[in-house]
From Swiss-Prot:
This is Large ribosomal subunit protein uL10. Pfam families: Ribosomal_L10 (PF00466). Keywords: Ribonucleoprotein, Ribosomal protein, RNA-binding, rRNA-binding. Forms part of the ribosomal stalk, playing a central role in the interaction of the ribosome with GTP-bound translation factors. One of its GO terms (molecular function) is large ribosomal subunit rRNA binding. It comes from Cupriavidus taiwanensis (strain DSM 17343 / BCRC 17206 / CCUG 44338 / CIP 107171 / LMG 19424 / R1). Disulfide bonds: none annotated. Belongs to the universal ribosomal protein uL10 family.
Length: 175
Protein backbone atom coordinates (compact mmCIF):
# COMPACT_ATOMS: atom_id res chain seq x y z
CA UNK A 1 0.00 0.00 0.00
CA UNK A 2 1.57 3.28 -1.04
CA UNK A 3 2.20 5.97 1.53
CA UNK A 4 0.43 9.29 1.21
CA UNK A 5 2.41 12.53 1.38
CA UNK A 6 1.82 13.00 5.12
CA UNK A 7 3.04 9.49 5.90
CA UNK A 8 6.13 10.07 3.75
CA UNK A 9 6.88 13.32 5.57
CA UNK A 10 6.53 11.51 8.90
CA UNK A 11 8.93 8.75 7.79
CA UNK A 12 11.49 11.30 6.55
CA UNK A 13 11.20 13.24 9.83
CA UNK A 14 11.68 10.07 11.91
CA UNK A 15 14.69 8.91 9.91
CA UNK A 16 16.15 12.44 9.86
CA UNK A 17 15.96 12.52 13.66
CA UNK A 18 17.89 9.23 13.83
CA UNK A 19 20.44 10.45 11.28
CA UNK A 20 20.99 13.67 13.24
CA UNK A 21 22.11 11.62 16.28
CA UNK A 22 24.06 9.03 14.28
CA UNK A 23 27.78 8.53 13.85
CA UNK A 24 27.46 5.74 11.30
CA UNK A 25 25.06 4.56 8.61
CA UNK A 26 25.49 1.18 6.94
CA UNK A 27 23.54 0.14 3.85
CA UNK A 28 23.02 -3.51 2.88
CA UNK A 29 21.07 -5.30 0.18
CA UNK A 30 18.59 -7.75 1.66
CA UNK A 31 17.13 -9.39 -1.47
CA UNK A 32 15.77 -12.88 -0.76
CA UNK A 33 16.11 -12.97 3.03
CA UNK A 34 13.40 -14.94 4.84
CA UNK A 35 11.13 -13.03 7.21
CA UNK A 36 12.31 -15.08 10.20
CA UNK A 37 15.93 -14.20 9.48
CA UNK A 38 15.07 -10.53 9.08
CA UNK A 39 13.27 -10.66 12.43
CA UNK A 40 16.42 -12.09 14.06
CA UNK A 41 18.47 -9.30 12.49
CA UNK A 42 16.08 -6.67 13.83
CA UNK A 43 16.25 -8.20 17.33
CA UNK A 44 20.07 -8.19 17.25
CA UNK A 45 20.04 -4.58 16.05
CA UNK A 46 17.65 -3.50 18.81
CA UNK A 47 19.86 -5.19 21.39
CA UNK A 48 22.90 -3.21 20.15
CA UNK A 49 21.02 0.10 19.93
CA UNK A 50 20.97 0.18 16.13
CA UNK A 51 18.04 1.75 14.29
CA UNK A 52 17.36 -0.73 11.48
CA UNK A 53 14.80 0.03 8.80
CA UNK A 54 13.83 -0.86 5.25
CA UNK A 55 13.08 2.41 3.47
CA UNK A 56 12.19 3.65 0.06
CA UNK A 57 15.46 4.99 -1.29
CA UNK A 58 13.94 8.34 -2.23
CA UNK A 59 12.82 8.86 1.37
CA UNK A 60 16.24 7.82 2.65
CA UNK A 61 17.93 10.30 0.30
CA UNK A 62 15.71 13.08 1.61
CA UNK A 63 16.49 12.09 5.20
CA UNK A 64 20.27 12.35 4.69
CA UNK A 65 20.11 15.52 2.59
CA UNK A 66 22.20 18.28 4.14
CA UNK A 67 23.92 15.95 6.64
CA UNK A 68 27.45 14.51 6.68
CA UNK A 69 25.89 11.32 5.25
CA UNK A 70 24.67 13.01 2.04
CA UNK A 71 27.46 11.37 0.01
CA UNK A 72 25.84 8.01 0.68
CA UNK A 73 22.87 8.96 -1.55
CA UNK A 74 24.66 7.66 -4.66
CA UNK A 75 24.71 4.15 -3.14
CA UNK A 76 20.97 4.11 -2.43
CA UNK A 77 19.67 1.89 -5.23
CA UNK A 78 17.87 -1.42 -5.06
CA UNK A 79 16.26 -3.12 -2.06
CA UNK A 80 18.22 -1.82 0.90
CA UNK A 81 18.10 -2.02 4.65
CA UNK A 82 19.58 0.89 6.58
CA UNK A 83 21.45 0.50 9.87
CA UNK A 84 21.83 3.78 11.75
CA UNK A 85 23.68 4.01 15.06
CA UNK A 86 25.06 6.50 17.54
CA UNK A 87 27.92 4.08 18.29
CA UNK A 88 30.55 4.31 15.57
CA UNK A 89 30.82 0.55 15.01
CA UNK A 90 27.50 -0.93 16.17
CA UNK A 91 25.58 -0.83 12.88
CA UNK A 92 28.57 -2.13 10.91
CA UNK A 93 29.10 -4.90 13.46
CA UNK A 94 25.43 -6.01 13.52
CA UNK A 95 25.04 -6.11 9.74
CA UNK A 96 28.48 -7.66 9.15
CA UNK A 97 27.90 -10.40 11.75
CA UNK A 98 24.53 -11.21 10.18
CA UNK A 99 26.05 -11.21 6.68
CA UNK A 100 28.57 -13.85 7.84
CA UNK A 101 25.75 -16.28 8.63
CA UNK A 102 23.35 -15.27 5.85
CA UNK A 103 24.87 -14.90 2.40
CA UNK A 104 21.75 -13.16 1.04
CA UNK A 105 22.56 -10.01 3.02
CA UNK A 106 25.21 -8.11 1.08
CA UNK A 107 26.95 -5.10 2.60
CA UNK A 108 26.92 -2.33 0.01
CA UNK A 109 28.28 0.82 1.61
CA UNK A 110 28.42 2.93 4.71
CA UNK A 111 29.25 6.38 5.93
CA UNK A 112 31.28 7.39 8.94
CA UNK A 113 32.68 10.78 9.87
CA UNK A 114 31.48 12.35 6.61
CA UNK A 115 33.25 9.75 4.47
CA UNK A 116 31.53 7.20 2.26
CA UNK A 117 32.84 3.68 2.88
CA UNK A 118 32.79 0.75 0.50
CA UNK A 119 31.89 -2.78 1.62
CA UNK A 120 35.50 -3.64 2.55
CA UNK A 121 35.80 -0.52 4.70
CA UNK A 122 32.50 -1.35 6.44
CA UNK A 123 33.86 -4.82 7.25
CA UNK A 124 37.05 -3.23 8.60
CA UNK A 125 34.95 -0.86 10.72
CA UNK A 126 33.00 -3.85 12.06
CA UNK A 127 36.22 -5.49 13.26
CA UNK A 128 37.03 -2.57 15.59
CA UNK A 129 35.96 -3.16 19.20
CA UNK A 130 32.99 -1.11 20.39
CA UNK A 131 33.37 1.76 22.85
CA UNK A 132 32.18 -0.41 25.75
CA UNK A 133 34.67 -3.17 24.85
CA UNK A 134 37.51 -0.63 24.66
CA UNK A 135 36.58 0.80 28.07
CA UNK A 136 36.51 -2.73 29.53
CA UNK A 137 39.95 -3.45 28.07
CA UNK A 138 41.32 -0.18 29.45
CA UNK A 139 39.93 -0.92 32.92
CA UNK A 140 41.43 -4.41 32.79
CA UNK A 141 44.84 -2.96 31.97
CA UNK A 142 44.52 -0.35 34.72
CA UNK A 143 43.35 -2.88 37.33
CA UNK A 144 46.08 -5.45 36.65
CA UNK A 145 48.85 -3.72 38.66
CA UNK A 146 46.48 -2.89 41.53
CA UNK A 147 45.11 -6.42 41.77
CA UNK A 148 48.66 -7.83 41.60
CA UNK A 149 49.69 -5.55 44.47
CA UNK A 150 46.61 -6.62 46.46
CA UNK A 151 47.50 -10.31 45.96
CA UNK A 152 51.06 -9.57 47.08
CA UNK A 153 49.81 -7.90 50.28
CA UNK A 154 47.43 -10.80 50.95
CA UNK A 155 50.24 -13.33 50.50
CA UNK A 156 52.51 -11.29 52.77
CA UNK A 157 49.80 -11.09 55.43
CA UNK A 158 49.22 -14.84 55.19
CA UNK A 159 52.95 -15.52 55.52
CA UNK A 160 53.20 -13.27 58.58
CA UNK A 161 50.16 -14.97 60.10
CA UNK A 162 51.81 -18.37 59.61
CA UNK A 163 55.03 -17.06 61.15
CA UNK A 164 53.14 -15.54 64.09
CA UNK A 165 51.25 -18.75 64.86
CA UNK A 166 54.40 -20.86 65.57
CA UNK A 167 55.90 -18.01 67.63
CA UNK A 168 52.74 -17.90 69.78
CA UNK A 169 52.85 -21.68 70.16
CA UNK A 170 56.48 -21.50 71.34
CA UNK A 171 55.63 -18.73 73.83
CA UNK A 172 52.73 -20.78 75.20
CA UNK A 173 54.95 -23.89 75.49
CA UNK A 174 57.63 -21.98 77.42
CA UNK A 175 55.13 -20.62 79.92
Amino acid sequence: MPLNIEDKKAVVAEVSAQVAKAQTIVVAEYRGIAVGDLTKLRAAARQQGVYLRVLKNTLARRAVEGTPFAGLAEQMTGPLIYGISEDAVASAKVLNDFAKTNDKLVLRAGSYDGKVLDAAAVKALASIPSRDELIAQLLGVMQAPVSGFARLLAALAAKKAEGAAPAEAEAAAEA
